[in-house]
């Protein structure tokens, strides 16, 4: 009985071994007939490789997107960030006060000369447009507070208080200043130029930045033009009167 059982076990083992060899043989023959790209093992490896590549590409894209966002963010930050520091504002305002005291003339009369005296004390390399724009904004900020009745003692922030004090020295409204500017502000030039598409507020602010010498030249030419207009009006009136007299004489 034991002998029979042993023979059966050996027979089954031989069958399993034979079947296993046959499967391996069939597998090898099948792989030989398959093209490399049709080999299941190659296909699986390629799929795994493609998957890894895709993951890498996705990772790169995400990284690039992240970098782009950072650059974009940084770019926006650099574009919109405040480039004039608190110290720069004080240097600029104090420089305007000192320039007028030392040179005996307003920085508006010699903007290039004024910029040369302070540009090395600013924390960045500012061009003339940046200087004039910053001066205009500081002036607008001061005048807004002034017109709203703000007093320097009511300003809690030390920087704001210092800026207000210096701005007051430079731009405190006076009757003399208002009289000097009245001829332009109240002239028809403002309305005429505004009709060309320039904002009146922008024009008035820009006019305040024009050197006094240039303003005087414009004012003199404007007066000459008004005199010529008055003379032309007088001649026109005289001419109409003569024509009217001729018509009256002819009807009589």
UniProtKB/Swiss-Prot annotation:
Residues 28-57 have a biased composition (Basic and acidic residues). The keyword Transport does not apply. It comes from the Eukaryota. Keywords: Transcription, Transcription regulation. GO terms for biological process: regulation of DNA-templated transcription. Residues 18-57 are annotated as: Disordered. Pfam families: GeBP-like_C, GeBP-like_DBD. Transmembrane segments: none annotated. Residues 18-27 have a biased composition (Basic residues). Belongs to the GeBP family. This is Probable transcription factor At2g01370. It comes from Arabidopsis thaliana (Mouse-ear cress).
